[in-house]
Amino acid sequence: ASIMDDWAKQFGLTETQKGEIFGVGLWPFAISIVLFSLIVDKIGYGLAMAFAFVCHVGYMVIVIAAPNIAGADPKTGYWVLYIGSFVGALGNGTVEAVINPVVATMFNKEKTKWLNILHAGWPGGLVLGGVLALALGDLDWRFKVGLVGIPVLGYGLLMV
């Protein structure tokens, strides 16, 4: 939430706008997980993960560039953050649509065990990300957004 507070100050966001940006970080996740779950076997895991990679990199570029794109216009700043968060959420849902069948296929004799381990890792990552963001304290919010690049680079290298 500290990044959101920084965004609110820099872009003059209202409480409603903050809520809308938080919300757009969620509902596109649901859309992409459903849509990609329906087509992932047809298009392949690699193409789906490439889409997710582009979305995650796009999120970082759009959001980090928001001050340059928006200038002094708070309305533009809101929309840049909104669009960036939308794109990032599409990537998140796509990863989820891919990782479940991949794990179930790789560990077909112990699916439940490994899917549970996988999903236990998500809150661990959220906690780790939160601790890192807090540890970075007053460091510019753009560096905190840049933390997303660590796992994105990781899975990007795995795809190569």
Report each predicted region and the residues it spans.
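Residue-level signature of mid-helix packing/kink "hotspots" within the transmembrane helices
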Residues: L26-V34, V127
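Helix-loop-helix hairpin linking two adjacent transmembrane segments in secondary transporters
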Residues: K109-E110, W114-V160
